[in-house]
């Protein structure tokens, strides 16, 4: 095996984030651990835990390069990948690597990536080694790397931010409760810089939150720790976004850590919203960048209304003969007409031949011959029944009364 990269962490810096990781481990448990190698040019490699947030959200629990003690790259810059990823939950579901890595009992932790000599230039396996503070225990976790995934932190690098809105804990809690009530449907978010309000709409439900405008631009606002959490924002343009309600609720819950951070909503011109954890001054200097990207999500209400609209299947009015000119004459068939109602069987006299017919008896007439056969039979049946009733009249039964 050939070693491609080696990474050693500052375990004390990771242990400081144990409370933050425990707050988000429910979502991060089924995700991946990713090492961003593109960020080497921006200060060093970054370790991040990446997972999904609801229907259309992406969580990035990223550790700053300050938590990396040593980094060695045994490949050339052309051969090294942009990022390497592996599962957070080990096979067998017996060990969560992230929980062990951010634990307070770890004294040394390192990652080693390697590949087979006959393989390509990309690393194929990773080995996580941890030594505990009892000077005796030591653990090794080896697994295969996942297919290439782009770094989560670089998805918004080329996006233009047009506004930021900070939510105080009470406001974020009310918005989170409202978003949970909407289920997994779509939420239309409107940011109005003229009225200093943010409107959230889902079907007939609507929630309006106001904020205090700041005198700086979006890129200059909230650059440092938050000293006082209050509803404020720096917005330079009007924007309308559509996000998933469950993803919005999960993002607000993740970025609102008690006594550590408050959520900050970042609006981009492309319609994407990123909920970022703004660290409080009381939390100290934590090497953490926690964010949830909310992608565009078409609301179920709009999809349902589109699907429920009946299609206009009525034929269009066309000039006479238009349909006959579009296909050959022998293929045109008249429009089907409803079948005629059942008719009473009648007897008709045959057509008279040219030769003289025999004389008709005197007791029959043309009127009798043309009369329907069913009518004649019905009359005969009625007359015979009447004669039977006259011959045998119905006898009246007398009931016996013992009191007489």
Swiss-Prot record:
Primary subcellular site in the record, as a coarse category: virion
Modification after translation (UniProt): Phosphorylated by the viral BGLF4 kinase.
Keywords annotated in UniProt: Activator, Disulfide bond, DNA-binding, Early protein, G1/S host cell cycle checkpoint dysregulation by virus, Host nucleus, Host-virus interaction, Modulation of host cell cycle by virus, Phosphoprotein, Transcription, Transcription regulation, Virion, Virion tegument
Superkingdom: Viruses
Region (Disordered): 302-404
Modified residues (Phosphoserine): 337, 349
Compositionally skewed regions (Pro residues) per UniProt: 335-344
A cellular component term, taken from the record's GO annotations: viral tegument
Compartments, as annotated in UniProt: Virion tegument; Host nucleus
Domain statement: The N-terminus is important for dimerization, DNA binding, and DNA polymerase processivity. The C-terminus mediates transcriptional activation.
Role description: Acts as a DNA polymerase processivity factor; a transcriptional activator for several EBV promoters and inhibits the host DNA damage response (DDR) to double-stranded DNA breaks. Plays an essential role in the viral lytic DNA replication by acting as a polymerase accessory subunit. Stimulates the viral DNA polymerase activity and appears to function with it as a holoenzyme. Increases the processivity of the viral polymerase, probably by acting as a sliding clamp that prevents dissociation of the polymerase from the active template.
Subunit structure: Homodimer. Two dimers can adopt a tetrameric ring-like structure. Forms a complex with the DNA-binding protein BALF2, the DNA polymerase subunit BALF5, and the alkaline exonuclease BGLF5. Interacts (via N-terminus) with BZLF1 (via bZIP domain); this interaction may inhibit BZLF1-induced transcription of the BMRF1 promoter. Interacts (via C-terminus) with host NuRD complex; this interaction is important for transcriptional activation of EBV promoters and inhibition of the ubiquitination step of DDR signaling.
Annotated protein name in UniProt: DNA polymerase processivity factor BMRF1
């Amino acid at each position: 095996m050939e070693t491609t990269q080696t990474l050693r962490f500052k375990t004390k810096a990771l242990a400081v984030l144990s409370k933050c990781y425990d707050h988000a481990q429910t979502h991060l448990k089924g995700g991946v651990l990713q090492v961003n190698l593109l960020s080497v040019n921006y200060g060093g490699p970054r370790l991040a835990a990446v997972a999904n947030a609801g229907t259309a959200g992406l969580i990035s629990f990223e550790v700053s390069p300050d938590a990396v003690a040593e980094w060695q790259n045994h490949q050339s810059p052309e051969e090294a990948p942009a990022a390497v990823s592996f599962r957070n939950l080990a096979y067998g579901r017996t060990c969560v690597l992230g929980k062990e890595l951010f634990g307070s009992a770890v004294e040394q932790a390192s990652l080693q990536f390697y590949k087979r000599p006959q393989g390509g230039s990309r690393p194929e396996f990773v080995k996580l080694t941890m030594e505990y503070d009892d000077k005796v225990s030591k653990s090794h976790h080896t697994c295969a790397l996942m297919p290439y995934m782009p770094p989560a932190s670089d998805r918004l690098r080329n996006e233009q931010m047009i506004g930021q809105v900070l939510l105080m804990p009470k406001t974020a809690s009310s918005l989170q409760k409202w978003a949970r009530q909407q289920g997994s449907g779509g939420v239309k978010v409107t940011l109005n810089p003229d009225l200093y309000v943010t409107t959230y709409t889902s079907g007939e439900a609507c929630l309006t939150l106001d904020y205090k405008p700041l005198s700086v631009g979006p890129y200059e606002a909230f650059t440092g720790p938050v000293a006082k959490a209050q509803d404020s924002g720096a917005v330079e343009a009007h924007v309308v976004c559509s996000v998933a309600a469950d993803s919005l609720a999960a993002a607000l819950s993740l970025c609102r850590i008690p006594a550590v951070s408050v959520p900050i909503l970042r609006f981009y011109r492309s319609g994407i919203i990123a909920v970022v954890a703004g660290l409080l001054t009381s939390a100290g200097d934590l090497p953490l960048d926690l964010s949830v990207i909310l992608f565009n999500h078409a609301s179920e209400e709009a999809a349902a209304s589109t699907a429920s609209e009946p299609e206009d299947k009525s034929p269009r009015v066309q000039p006479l003969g238009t349909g006959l000119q579009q296909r050959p004459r022998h293929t045109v068939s008249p429009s089907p007409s409803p079948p005629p109602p059942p008719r009473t069987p009648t007897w008709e006299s045959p057509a008279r031949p040219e030769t003289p017919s025999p004389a008709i008896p005197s007791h029959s007439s043309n009127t009798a011959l043309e009369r329907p056969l069913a009518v004649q039979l019905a009359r005969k049946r009625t007359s015979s029944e009447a004669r039977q009733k006259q011959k045998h009249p119905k006898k009246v039964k007398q009931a016996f009364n013992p009191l007489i």
